[in-house]
A protein has these predicted regions:
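Short, well-ordered alpha-helix to beta-strand connector turns
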Residues: 62-63, 113
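Glycine-rich, charge-decorated loop segments at or immediately adjacent to ligand/cofactor-binding or catalytic sites
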Residues: 101-115
Length: 132
């Protein structure tokens, strides 16, 4: 895929429980025909001071935000805040069901009607391409 047509993506995830899932997405981003580049991801630091300002700056610089949902995502305040910022900045986002064999949770502030998509290569490519 031509580099200029690839989307710049920010990945929002629960650092305490789902860093392995972010690493899987990093691996998929290296696939030769991937439609995206991982530009940035969640910041591992306390939510205080200028954390939100840093997150907003990172999210502003991308085309799309991917929220990875795991079993404890509803307890990760930062994920909910990052997705709220994505909305405020009018950045499209979608949620991936991070663990196929587990009960994954939406972040705080995300409506139960917001779909979590199965994490498959075909789904990921389609979702990055705008199929939602």
């Amino acid at each position: 895929m031509h580099l200029s047509s690839r989307k710049r993506v920010f990945v929002s995830f629960d650092f305490d429980h789902d860093e392995d899932l972010k690493n899987l997405l990093v691996g998929q981003a290296k696939h030769p025909d991937t439609p995206f580049d991982l530009a940035d991801w969640s910041i591992k630091e306390a939510i205080s001071g200028n954390w939100e300002q840093k997150a907003r700056s990172r999210i502003r610089s991308v085309d799309l935000v991917i929220g990875i949902c795991g079993e404890w995502t509803h307890t990760a305040r930062g994920v909910g805040i990052e997705l709220r910022i994505a909305r405020e900045e009018r950045k499209p986002f979608f949620l991936l069901w991070g663990r196929a064999d587990r009960n994954c949770q939406r972040p705080i502030g995300i409506e139960p009607t917001e779909k979590m998509y199965r994490w498959t290569w075909d789904n990921l490519r389609a979702l990055v391409g705008g199929a939602r």
